[in-house]
Amino acid sequence: MRVKRGNVARKRRKKILKLAKGFRGAGSKLFRTANQQVMKALRSAYRDRRRKKRDFRRLWIARINAATRAQGLRYSEFIDGLKKGNIQLNRKMLARLAFLDPEAFTQVVEAARQARAS
């Protein structure tokens, strides 16, 4: 029996061109170019969704480190003090606290310092 493809190919190409909307030049007009651009864009999006998590964690650590060094404590010592003092604040919240409410952050640093001392 003969298999008729109907409009399968057209639908597939239209789907790719729709994804390529907004790309520059031939990247949004010609199927082969658009297909390559879309595949690369999807690969980058997949990779960068994972990278974003790493990048934000690095940013939070850098901010916390800067804030703790201003108080005379290294980042590693600060985290050690938090663990020993059973203070369960994640790095995102610590970075926000250091940026938005320095007084409260100072209290957390002091609590970590005392937990390390005891």
Swiss-Prot record:
Domain of life: Bacteria
Function: Binds directly to 23S ribosomal RNA and is necessary for the in vitro assembly process of the 50S ribosomal subunit. It is not involved in the protein synthesizing functions of that subunit.
A GO cellular component annotation in the UniProt record: ribonucleoprotein complex
Protein name: Large ribosomal subunit protein bL20
UniProt family annotation: Belongs to the bacterial ribosomal protein bL20 family.
Keyword list, A-Z: Ribonucleoprotein, Ribosomal protein, RNA-binding, rRNA-binding
Family annotation (PROSITE patterns): RIBOSOMAL_L20
Biological process per Gene Ontology, one example term: translation
CDD domains hit by this protein: Ribosomal_L20
Disulfide topology: none
Example GO molecular function: structural constituent of ribosome
Organism of this sequence: Synechococcus sp. (strain JA-3-3Ab)
